[in-house]
């Protein structure tokens, strides 16, 4: 139980018993933590900041990767951005699942110093590859540049050089 020393002393000097329950124990603490996060988001205008930085990140991704022959789509909202990888950009045919693209991209991204979320099975549970990017709300412009460069390094290492 979390409480102030004053509350604890009242219980201790009373019956010594604190009988309570919830259908989902621990929820008050989780709710208090969530409330603190919401206050931080509002007081520091982080939602607006996320939208602004997200637009910048989206533009950077479009500029860097939109003409890549293996990029089928780039989209997102705020700082939550995704890139779909395909065998052919025009037909949007998925990469062969046997290539294990997401696994290789994750390894290459990690080696480049980038933590991201590549996954396969985007289309039907087996076919389709993508990477999700979700940098923190407090990311700076220089770090956005670094993120895109590291992602480019990882994609190039995974798929090979492109023009």
Positions of predicted regions on the chain:
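Conserved N-terminal phosphate-binding loop of PLP-dependent enzymes in the Aspartate aminotransferase
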Residues: 1-163
